[in-house]
């Protein structure tokens, strides 16, 4: 016996006899009487038609029919009927109507037992087709569609491949086997069924002995006659029945509205009198229509003869009963078995929107126009955002010149000690009307307005008649204006001019004469905010595929195929085309295929295999009469294919609506007049159902065996509790592969405890297929599960409603799993993402999050002085820590408990908020109260509150309000971090977005930088949509002028990118030709436009200088692009354009270095850093500023051979070549010392690695700088298993040679050490700033910065917990370690070898000889008649070496000239001649190895003879060699030759040699006292003197006198062979009180350590400690004396 279980599934009872149930049945007599009356009426109508055409059913036909495999079995039999008849004796022509109906009701007519039984039995044709639900896994001939129209949502169905225990599945469990039992089977209902509204008696048993036969597509003529005979009843009724008011008004659509009386007591019954089963498909859904919103009378349908009789015989006053697809659900309880109770899914109103009906009442396919409009409906959140931006826009009217100047303002940086040395500068100002510029000297502290007044004095006699405010100073060569209210020296342009020692050129203009084409206009102010209007030119890496136009095309194609399928004779082929159209729609929707779509497609395939009904054109002599006299109330029998098509269309439109809502992030729950419940009162647990992942690639199917999800809930970047793992499942295949879980996930947290910013994370993992051999990774056998992708979803929407309904979440592959809370996932190309279907509960009310009420009148502030001393000390220690990183749990608890004691220390607020125990609603009132009484933070301190650790909207809004105090120029420096901080905003319309857009409205430089940063961020997988919206808002409010300029820049970047790609792909020999041809296209762009440089918008280019364009010989083959400045007063513009490398990391490193430089400048330390610009213009491409007059260290060193990196002089000699005078060289050396110190500190703090001589550059002015920051934060480049960067930073001996001015240490090296330590300590004070800046960049996707762990290097490098003195000692040791590292030189050497393939002669614009800046020819200088090495001289520079005097006599000259060359310069000449003339026989060069010292007189004398012989042989060689430009350049006189410097040095110039017993020099000490300890730091000693003039090995020894036992002896390490040692060592004396120390003296002695004799005294000093103020540090130089020492 079959019955309905409590979970609405059928169960087979063990007993064959059911227990009696107290229900009431219509007895047999009543039922037969009703049937007889109906048949009598039909017989009467039949007499009006022609006599039936008879035919015989042959035995062969019967056998063929019996031969079919029948997969369906009847569940119901009627024992009161006669026994089954054999078809062999039937004469169809003689059959009466009643006999035909009997055949129809005979379950065993012309059937026989099939060879194989189906998985699940199905109902017989006589069973009610209206209330029959097929199991999801069953196959049969009846179509899976509803008979007749309906207006409800289809219940949840599941693909047959993934059987699911649904609410009701045809009365049987899917796991129930088939049973060909002859015993009676009963259908019964549980007694406690809540939906059963009438009693039933025990049901009449059914005998499942037969089933409806499966029909072939083609039937024999004999069978066709029988079918025609049986169907004639329905045909007559169908074609002859007059239309009545009982017919529904809309019969054309696939789904129509049916009104069901809510008062009906009988909900679900099976009607057994289905008299025309062949004209209707069997229904696979049992659904109840419930429309509470519509109150009008229901419409009843009659779809078979028995229904027509029942409807016609009813009294007009009879109560209209509930109908399901035209079947009565109440009235007389006519039963053959107990009816089934079935509840359907909830209905959606949208079904009616896709139904239409023409005036004739015929059926038509839905157009879906109302649904398509949903794709154009703007997201509610986006609409609210547009309104907010429009309101913001009104605050910046175009008439306000302060916020809308139309030109760029020169950025300013405040410098300390600006009025020191060289405070006056020379200014040259171009004035209209004057032929020559006005030149005068002014103070750098003077305001720009004063400079303007000085310039106006040259053209106006009376300034009282002049409006000084209408004049501006424009930078020559740039569209950039100085700010009148700032001092001249604070502008970055002026600072760069002073740095490069170039002339300051300005132009005096009136405001009206200044180009203001970037200003907004009245039309711009009136234009509405449209986020998509100006994005059409933006290259979107992830294309939108769900727009109305493509969806409309797909739907049109689908409906066209449906119409063809319904009209064509060959429906099999047409249905295949329909299914293909459905597949295309699902493919366009990212491969999402809902269960209803899957089931509808299967039912359509089954329906097309059914025999088609007799068409309407059946010939009949009295057909028209028949139609006129048809019985009222009867309807067309439904076409099975039509019904299946209707349900398929419904499923497709449901899918489209779901996808549209998900794409627009719309809620699935209608708001309307629903009740609202506050979240803090909701005690329900958070739960949802993970249904499936759609669009799985075939690679995953072959590589992974199982899949599972990790579900986590986070807030403030941390999990609220342990993540939950789903079950492990495999993949399935319908249209596409999918992973199906259908699993309920319940989090152990109540909704009331959820913070507003709670984020759900779903991470997909794959378990590798151990048997898969197709994977290229052989190690997969040993690997664990792999993370395949991640997606995040905020639980409360922007209106603060809890999410509900079905969501499609876009999950990205493992290379993009850096998901951040609050992301609106960005859609990609079809099948490039995985779509995760998640179903949230849809309660009857909305849950909304409301903020707690804050009592602002309560002010609590505890005084820190009232705390106990130990608690106070601990609290101050935590407060004064530089960062909240590394706070322990105990520290956080302690800090939170004492938070009100910290109000006088505002900058500790981030630490306190990070220590909050939780952010539950119940605790927010206290937290917000603390926030609102907290003193304002400075902008840089408030920046930390924008990190992921602080997701609370109140906190972030307050932080942004404090940010308002930051200047535009400071904001421009931090803009990349602000752009990344947008990812931590939960909603689009945030205070941070409005803040950035407001600053962009008031400053063109910020708008320009923000544009390129947002454009580059469009490539972000998770946040591309958000950045697209912000970028659209920026372009919408920025004005037409700015948009047109940005469009031109983007076009220029695209053109240069194409050129760079072509050059990279070209072969080496054709690259230059390809470059020149490709640049012609770029040149054509400039013929139509002038264009601002994306790198620096103040630079405007008007054309290319194609002849100067080239490419660099490196892996990426970057372009050197030379452009002509549009300003005739400006210089050429040179930039590098690179394709194939990610420049975002370079941008970050350069930004950090620039911020460091500004910190140093504000503190008065100018390290003369070279800050060049870098901009990423797209994925793996960008533009870099070229620093003029600079070369790499490799180029400089290889001029001295491949081993040049092991030599000490190349850098010094290269600088001397470009700075020939002593004054110039001294200035260049000073620039080198300062810039080298800054580079050492910056590269160490940032952990910049992969440092070799090809990414360190030197300018001719002496400024050193680094390029190429592909490795940083300590991620070193590996050489095998060894780190290539073994030293803390690059400081080589050739650098030290320039710093010292020679081989021996001097006081200049002490200056270098002091500069390094001072710069290091200044950066250490800003540890929190740099950690915050880097932390905000974690979600940017940089390969070297992926997690908070990467910041550990920076924190350790900055040593935040040490004192300045300890940090000074620490960094001094780093300098010593770097200087003594042979690994750096070896790394340089290896790189020289690797770059040999790029070696050769320099290009025309490079010097041919290292010591000569230009190339000369004999045409200019005249031919040489005689040349010889005249003599040699000893020279000090500062080391001793010999220089050779070459005597030259030229044609046409009577007097010889002399040039001075070193032996190394002769050798360079020979080496380069060998390169130029590899096939010529050159004279041999005297380069034999010299043992011992080389710079001695004997060696010089021998070399003089050898070099003279070499020159004679060279001049007697071929004229091609002897008269080449290289030889001419070698003999061309230099500035040093003309001044005859360095030939002989006077005796007084010889290094000082002290007389016996002479003492000299000074020592620099730092003396401080704290915590009962005296600290003596020995820093430097300078100008030591020895008896014999040899370099000593100094060290320092100290005592605290009196000390008879010498227990206070302390000493430093020994510094070898130097008169100017640097120690920076701390000598500590512990356990001394201040009173005791005032009675002591510090005795310091400097001695030289000797190995073969006794150490000798170099000087000393005795310092009474009572003269020191021990409460502060004292740093001072002390002169050494000849005092006695212990």
Curated annotation (Swiss-Prot):
Modification type Phosphoserine: residues: 60, 261, 328, 339, 630, 1281, 1553
UniProt xrefs under Pfam families: C2, PI3_PI4_kinase, PI3K_C2, PI3K_rbd, PI3Ka, PX
Domain PI3K/PI4K catalytic: 1105-1383
Tissue: Expressed in brain (at protein level). Detected in podocytes.
GO cellular-component term (any): clathrin-coated vesicle
Keywords, alphabetical: Acetylation, ATP-binding, Cell membrane, Cytoplasm, Cytoplasmic vesicle, Endocytosis, Exocytosis, Golgi apparatus, Kinase, Lipid metabolism, Membrane, Nucleotide-binding, Nucleus, Phosphoprotein, Transferase
Every C2 domain range: 1559-1678
Region Catalytic loop, residue ranges: 1247-1255
Region annotation (Interaction with PtdIns(4,5)P2-containing membranes) ranges: 1488-1493
Motif (Nuclear localization signal): 1606-1617
Catalytic activity: a 1,2-diacyl-sn-glycero-3-phospho-(1D-myo-inositol 4-phosphate) + ATP = a 1,2-diacyl-sn-glycero-3-phospho-(1D-myo-inositol-3,4-bisphosphate) + ADP + H(+); a 1,2-diacyl-sn-glycero-3-phospho-(1D-myo-inositol) + ATP = a 1,2-diacyl-sn-glycero-3-phospho-(1D-myo-inositol-3-phosphate) + ADP + H(+); a 1,2-diacyl-sn-glycero-3-phospho-(1D-myo-inositol-4,5-bisphosphate) + ATP = a 1,2-diacyl-sn-glycero-3-phospho-(1D-myo-inositol-3,4,5-trisphosphate) + ADP + H(+)
Free-text description of this protein's post-translational modifications in UniProt: Phosphorylated on Ser-261 during mitosis and upon UV irradiation; which does not change enzymatic activity but leads to proteasomal degradation. Phosphorylated upon insulin stimulation; which may lead to enzyme activation.
Start and end residues of each PI3K-RBD domain: 422-510
Subunit (UniProt): Interacts with ERBB2 and EGFR. Interacts with clathrin trimers. Interacts with SBF2/MTMR13.
UniProt-recorded name of the protein: Phosphatidylinositol 4-phosphate 3-kinase C2 domain-containing subunit alpha
Originating organism: Mus musculus
Gene, per the UniProt record: Pik3c2a
